[in-house]
């Protein structure tokens, strides 16, 4: 029986009381070095043999059976906990590693509310039971992450390409692990693609793996098999698919590396891959000028769940849900996450919904803005406030993607498929960097939500993000006006060349304007003492006039209003305190109202 393994590590700083109380039980040091471990009873599950006695320093395992609709979230064990869920989604094996003393352990379980039924659709249930499997979800996100599929169903000679709301594939498609809006009675059907005939591949055996050296077929759609000649396919060598006249390539799970020039000068238009592919670079697709779409299916557990990168997809969920409604979208990097009280904007502009799409300034803004634009309509408002310390990214000049781009896509890879790869560079090199970055990270699950953690990754009792996407953990004012970092930023005309930054951001703004979307430029907050020596008052006046004359959208705010004493900043030189965010929001509301009133009078 195939199992999906989730390895989670729980670290708790223990306060040793005289009584020896730990967690839910009592710590006892036994002369015979024996430890008595008990899994406590609770709602939603049953434990087989809940009491065990083992030698100190050894592992102890338990089998837990979940009730219908329940999910096991973890335990309060202080050490490393290994949780293995069988494909029936009800039987769970818990292994507590290196127990050193006696204690009772609490299991954390919660009842799922949202049922999705998965249909094998000519595939086979891995558990050998029914061709349909129902899974219940907690609904921690506005949309629900689907099953990765490969842990539910299999089909000899086929690769699962995704899910669809109709068996014949004519309904709504969703990638494995990506998100879908839930509705009662939702059924998702596995979508299968047959492997391309083995005779079309030339390969050799290397260390027990198949290495593809050439493709001799002429199919418009190629599905590279998971195995050839009974050997798992691991690598696609240089030039293997060079000059191939095909439109679609599907890389099956298990393929580890795509070497440089593997698809050089092919007619490839769209590519499917799984997130267990580790080594790949843009050299593999050199001169593939027609490649525009990348579909990524999840097969690995997520690493960035609960991280601020993960907030992008939660914000994107809200944006999608408001696609047909009138809205104001706030954008830049983390200064926008920290810098607005969106409820105030909502109240001030009651005809509009509000979405805060700010996440991270040091990743290219261009792909983020393109995804945002796809969800906006005529009459909507984009309020952009680029961060000057990341100007090459924030002004859409940087076309190279990076690891953070994919970190923001991890919990919904389908969003990335909405981008046209021809508008960007270093796509696959960035994906490889993302894979390297998360290689040694603790793996989590999609039910973990960023709003359960603060900016530093600590659990919080109240949600850290509100419905709009603002970071709302209380941030007191500082006691010092001094900058946090020694990073003086240039607020000078020379720092924003027209042929690079201005022309690039204007080109992106024009795409919004062409759709009838109103775009306004305001300034991101900054500690006024964290500017370069060249950024004098006179130079800042010149810069403000420069933006007003060169940008193709209205500059609605005064630059000087964006410079704050350090008292109103928190932790960095551009993250506002709670009070600072309210002060800034009041100013922006005033500026936006004046601009809209001015336009009404024209």
Where are these regions (language model features)?
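C-terminal regions of proteins
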Residues: 534-602
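Structural signature of tandem-repeat unit edges
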Residues: 200-207, 217-234, 244-257, 266-279, ...
């Amino acid at each position: 029986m195939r199992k999906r393994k989730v390895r989670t590590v729980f670290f708790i700083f223990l306060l040793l009381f005289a009584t020896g109380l730990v967690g839910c039980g009592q710590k006892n040091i036994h002369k015979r070095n024996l430890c008595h471990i008990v899994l406590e009873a609770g709602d939603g599950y049953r434990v087989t043999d809940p009491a065990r006695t083992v030698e100190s320093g050894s592992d102890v395992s338990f089998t837990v059976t979940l009730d219908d609709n329940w999910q096991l979230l973890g335990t309060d064990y202080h050490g490393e906990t290994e949780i293995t869920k069988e494909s029936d989604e009800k039987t769970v094996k818990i292994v507590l590693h290196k127990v050193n003393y006696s204690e009772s352990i609490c299991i954390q379980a919660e009842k799922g509310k949202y049922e999705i039924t998965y249909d094998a659709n000519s595939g086979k249930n891995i558990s050998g039971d029914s061709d349909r499997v129902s899974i219940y979800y907690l609904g921690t996100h506005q949309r629900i992450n689907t099953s990765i599929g490969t842990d539910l169903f299999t089909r000899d000679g086929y690769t699962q390409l995704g899910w669809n709301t109709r068996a014949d594939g004519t309904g709504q498609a969703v990638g494995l692990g990506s998100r879908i809006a839930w509705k009662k009675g939702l059924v998702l059907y596995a979508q299968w693609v047959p492997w391309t005939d083995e005779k079309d591949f030339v390969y050799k055996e290397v260390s027990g793996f198949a290495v593809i050296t050439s493709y001799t077929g002429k199919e418009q759609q190629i599905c590279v098999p998971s195995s050839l000649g009974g050997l798992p396919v691991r690598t696609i060598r240089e030039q293997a698919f060079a000059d191939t006249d095909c439109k679609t390539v599907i890389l099956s799970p298990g393929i580890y590396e795509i070497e440089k020039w593997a698809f050089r000068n092919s007619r490839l238009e769209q590519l499917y891959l799984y997130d267990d592919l580790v080594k790949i670079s843009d050299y593999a697709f050199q001169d593939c000028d027609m490649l525009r779409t990348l579909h990524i299916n999840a097969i690995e557990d997520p690493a960035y769940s609960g991280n601020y990168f993960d907030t992008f997809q939660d914000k994107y969920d809200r944006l999608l849900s408001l696609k047909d409604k009138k809205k104001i979208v706030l954008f830049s990097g983390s200064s926008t996450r920290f810098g607005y009280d969106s409820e105030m904007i909502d109240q001030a502009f009651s005809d509009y919904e509000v979405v805060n799409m700010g996440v991270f300034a040091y990743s290219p803004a261009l792909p983020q803005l393109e995804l945002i634009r796809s969800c906006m309509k005529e009459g909507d408002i984009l309020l952009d406030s680029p961060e000057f310390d990341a100007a090459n990214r924030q002004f859409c000049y940087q076309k190279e993607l990076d690891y953070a781009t994919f970190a923001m896509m991890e919990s919904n890879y389908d969003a990335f498929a909405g981008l046209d790869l021809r508008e960007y560079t270093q796509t696959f090199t960035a994906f490889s960097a993302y894979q390297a970055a998360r290689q040694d990270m603790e793996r989590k699950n999609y039910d973990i939500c960023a709003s359960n953690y603060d900016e530093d990754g600590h659990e919080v009792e109240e949600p850290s993000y509100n419905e709009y996407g603002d970071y709302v953990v209380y941030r007191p004012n500082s006691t010092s006006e001094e900058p946090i970092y020694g990073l003086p930023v240039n607020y000078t005309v020379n720092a924003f060349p027209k042929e690079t930054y201005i022309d690039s951001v204007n080109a992106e703004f024009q795409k919004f304007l062409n759709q009838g979307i109103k775009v306004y430029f305001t300034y991101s907050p900054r500690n006024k003492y964290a500017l370069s020596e060249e950024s004098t008052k006179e130079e800042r006046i010149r810069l403000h006039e420069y933006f007003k004359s060169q940008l193709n959208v209205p500059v609605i705010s005064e630059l000087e209003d964006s410079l704050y004493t350090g008292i109103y900043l928190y932790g960095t030189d551009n993250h506002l305190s709670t009070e600072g965010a309210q002060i800034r929001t009041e100013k922006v509301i005033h500026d936006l109202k004046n601009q809209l009133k001015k336009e009404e009078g024209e």
